[in-house]
From Swiss-Prot:
Pathway: Carbohydrate metabolism; D-ribose degradation; D-ribose 5-phosphate from beta-D-ribopyranose: step 1/2. It catalyses: beta-D-ribopyranose = beta-D-ribofuranose. This is D-ribose pyranase. It comes from Klebsiella pneumoniae (strain 342). Its main location: cytoplasm. It is found in: Cytoplasm. The lineage of its organism: Bacteria, Pseudomonadati, Pseudomonadota, Gammaproteobacteria, Enterobacterales. Its EC number is 5.4.99.62. Belongs to the RbsD / FucU family. RbsD subfamily. Homodecamer. GO terms for biological process: D-ribose catabolic process.
Length: 139
């Protein structure tokens, strides 16, 4: 049995294949997943697992150098936005690097997901609970 944090075989595999600047999406239950993208569906029911639960596990094994977030989260989901920023700050400290945070419109965000290595769908049912993570290097 695998000893690492991520037990889900699909998530573990996609993280292990990421190269520098490759992207990975963690999203809520409502984000449309492009047909061209690999879909890893973790949603069991509304809210399970939450967006933050999935993100926290993914970032234990993924080196992150940048993140893209929809601008709309600031006004439509400020509590989750604050939680997300706190998590990214803690991740920066743990990794020992700066994580660049970029904001874009939700429409542009959806277009960018097509370029990601995979889209991991959570059971989150709150607005704009989505992030594109950009892989960094560990050296």
């Amino acid at each position: 049995m695998k000893k690492g944090t991520v037990l889900n075989a699909d998530i573990s595999a996609v993280i292990s294949r990421l190269g520098h600047t490759d992207t990975l999406v963690v999203c809520d239950a409502g984000l449309p997943v492009p047909r061209s993208s690999t879909r890893i569906d973790m949603a069991l029911t509304q809210g399970v697992p939450s967006f933050m639960q999935v993100l926290e596990v993914v970032t234990t094994e993924m080196q992150v150098e940048a993140a893209v977030i929809a601008e709309e989260i600031k006004t439509h989901n400020p509590q989750l936005h604050a939680t997300l920023l706190t998590h990214l700050e803690q991740l920066q400290q743990h990794q020992g690097n700066t994580i660049e945070i970029r904001y874009t419109s939700h429409e542009q965000f959806k277009k960018q997901t097509a370029d990601s290595q995979a889209v991991i769908r959570s059971g989150e049912c709150s607005p704009f609970a989505n992030i594109i993570l950009c892989a960094g290097v560990t050296f």
